[in-house]
């Protein structure tokens, strides 16, 4: 398979092509040297690109995505040699920063302070903000750097210490299950259920470029979605087509959509 042609087919722009090229190089390094190789942290959209690349290469085993805990949003791609069956869990390190004033930091505050120290985005995984602490997933070299260098976020003073994966304070997901029937599994129909919109408003959101399916832009309201697809609507959040059920006597389809609050 010609590498250039495949990258051109999978990537929508230069940034995506560059990312896929780097990931492909990591995969080839693993196969050629038979050693574990890990990428930086990837956004959900970037993870979907990696899945498409691995699918195109027909690679179904020997790699996985991991971000430090089961429901992590940002994850690394781990490519495993033939002698390894699990990823190097230590490639994802964690630390906790505590502060005195409750609810005085946001995700943006924390990320901004890390970027201000010169930490790259791909070196940082999920940022889990609690009332008087924040847990941050990073690469091990960055954890060592932050333990020595990170003592504040804006005007908020921090006390930073390393923690293990079992100590992570993962916020409980707040979701709402929405059940309805649709005439078909068109994107605009499912979107209207997930975000309580009229069909016309849902279609307008799609055509105006506000909607992503599995973190890829999609502007065709009649696109068919399938169970498990993640739908994101700019400004309103995301939902998942959780279940596709049987048809009613009139031919409509029962669906369950999980809306993240």
Task: Please place each PLM-identified region on the residue numbering.
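Ferredoxin-like alpha/beta domains used as RNA- or RNAP-binding modules
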Residues: 1-188, 194, 217, 224, ...
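Basic (Lys/Arg-enriched) interaction patch that binds polyanionic ligands
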Residues: 184-235
């Amino acid at each position: 398979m010609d590498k250039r042609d495949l990258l051109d087919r999978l990537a929508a722009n230069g940034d995506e092509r560059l990312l896929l090229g780097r990931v492909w190089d990591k995969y080839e390094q693993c196969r050629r040297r038979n050693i574990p190789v890990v990428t930086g942290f990837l956004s959900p959209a970037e993870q979907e690109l990696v899945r498409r690349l691995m699918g195109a290469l027909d690679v179904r085993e020997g790699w996985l995505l991991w971000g430090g805990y089961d429901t992590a949003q940002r994850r690394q791609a781990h490519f495993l040699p033939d002698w390894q069956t699990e990823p190097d869990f230590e490639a994802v390190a964690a630390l906790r920063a505590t502060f005195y004033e409750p609810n005085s930091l946001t995700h943006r505050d924390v990320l901004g302070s890390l970027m201000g120290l010169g930490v790259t985005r791909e070196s940082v995984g999920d940022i889990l903000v609690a009332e008087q602490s924040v847990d941050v997933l990073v690469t091990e070299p960055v954890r060592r750097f932050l333990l020595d260098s990170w003592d504040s976020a804006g005007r908020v003073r921090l006390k930073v210490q390393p923690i293990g994966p079992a100590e992570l304070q993962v916020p409980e997901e707040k979701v709402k299950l929405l059940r309805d029937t649709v005439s078909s599994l068109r994107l605009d129909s499912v979107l209207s259920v997930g975000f309580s919109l009229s069909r016309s408003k849902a279609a307008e959101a799609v055509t105006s470029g506000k909607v992503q399916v599995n973190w890829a832009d999609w502007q065709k309201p009649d696109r068919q979605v399938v169970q498990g697809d993640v739908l994101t609507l700019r400004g309103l959040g995301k939902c998942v087509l959780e279940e596709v059920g049987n048809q009613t006597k009139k031919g409509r389809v029962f669906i369950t959509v999980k809306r993240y609050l």
